[in-house]
C-alpha cells in the first residue's frame, strides 16, 4: 500500500537494500540499530516509553578501527523521518559513548521553514523557541542523548512525536545468528493462535 503524504511525495512502505557481499548492507542496519537503541534505551530503562516497545538488540557505537585517523574521530548519524505531518531531522555525534553534538529540527511536510527544537554542542545546549522555557533543564549526562532526556522528564509535543517514531522502529538483521533463533509474536491472541496453528501444520 502506498503511504499518501500530500502535499509532499507519496511513499512506499518498504525499502530494499541491494549490494554485493561486503558492500555495507549489514553495517547500515547496524548503524540504524545503534542510533535507535541509543535514543530509546534510556527511556525504556526509566519506564517512560509512550508505545508498546519491542526491545532491540543494543549495538555499540564503535568507530572504524583500521584507520588511525577515524579511530579517534566521532561517529556521526543523520536521520530524516516523517510523523504527524512533520519531517524531522535528527543529528547525533558520539565518541566513546559520549555525546559530542546533537540536534533536532522539524518542518511541516511540504513546507520550507525549518524550526530548531534544540541544538547541543558539548555541554552547551540551545533550545528552540517552541521549547525555550526556563523550567527545562539543560544539565544532562554526557552519555545520554538530550532527546532521551527531554522524553523522560517533560511532556513536549514535538519530542513526544520523535520519541514515538523511534520507539516504533523494528530492525531485524538476520546476519546476526542470535536473531535467527528468535521469533517475534503479536500480543493479539487471534493472530498468535493463527501463527502457532500455521507452524503446527508445517510439522
Task: Set out the residue ranges of the language-model regions.
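Short, hydrophobic/aromatic-rich segments at coil-to-beta transitions
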Residues: 71-79, 100
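Electropositive, glycine-dotted interaction segments
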Residues: 83-203
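Residue-level detector of short, conserved catalytic/binding motifs and their immediate flanks
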Residues: 13-15, 77, 90
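A short catalytic or substrate-binding loop motif that flags glycine-/basic-rich loops and adjacent residues
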Residues: 9, 70-73, 84
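Post-Walker A helix-loop "phosphate-sensing" segment adjacent to the P-loop in P-loop NTPases
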Residues: 35-47
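Short, hydrophobic/aromatic-enriched beta-strand segments in well-ordered soluble domains
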Residues: 31, 79-81
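AAA+/P-loop NTPase substrate/partner-engagement loops
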Residues: 49-70
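Pre-Walker A-like glycine/lysine-rich segment at the N-terminus of P-loop NTPase domains
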Residues: 1-34
Amino acid at each position: 500500500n502506498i503511504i499518501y503524504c500530500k502535499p509532499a511525495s507519496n511513499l512506499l512502505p518498504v525499502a530494499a537494500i541491494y549490494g554485493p557481499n561486503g558492500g555495507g548492507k549489514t553495517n547500515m542496519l547496524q548503524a540504524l540499530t545503534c542510533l535507535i537503541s541509543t535514543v530509546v534505551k534510556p527511556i525504556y530503562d526509566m519506564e517512560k516509553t509512550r508505545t508498546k516497545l519491542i526491545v532491540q538488540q543494543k549495538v555499540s557505537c564503535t568507530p572504524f578501527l583500521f584507520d588511525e585517523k577515524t579511530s579517534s574521530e566521532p561517529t556521526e548519524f543523520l536521520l530524516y523521518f516523517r510523523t504527524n505531518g512533520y519531517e524531522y531531522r535528527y543529528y547525533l555525534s558520539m565518541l566513546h559513548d559520549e555525546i559530542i553534538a546533537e540536534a533536532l529540527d522539524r518542518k511541516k511536510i511540504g513546507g520550507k521553514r525549518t524550526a530548531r527544537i534544540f541544538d547541543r554542542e558539548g555541554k552547551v545546549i540551545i533550545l528552540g523557541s517552541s521549547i525555550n522555557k526556563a523550567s527545562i533543564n539543560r544539565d544532562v549526562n554526557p552519555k545520554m542523548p538530550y532527546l532521551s532526556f527531554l522524553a523522560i522528564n517533560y511532556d513536549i509535543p514535538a519530542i513526544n512525536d520523535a520519541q514515538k517514531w523511534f520507539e516504533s522502529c523494528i530492525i531485524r538483521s538476520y546476519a546476526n545468528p542470535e536473531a535467527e533463533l528468535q521469533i517475534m509474536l503479536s500480543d493479539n491472541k487471534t493472530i498468535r493462535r493463527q501463527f502457532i496453528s500455521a507452524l503446527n501444520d508445517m510439522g
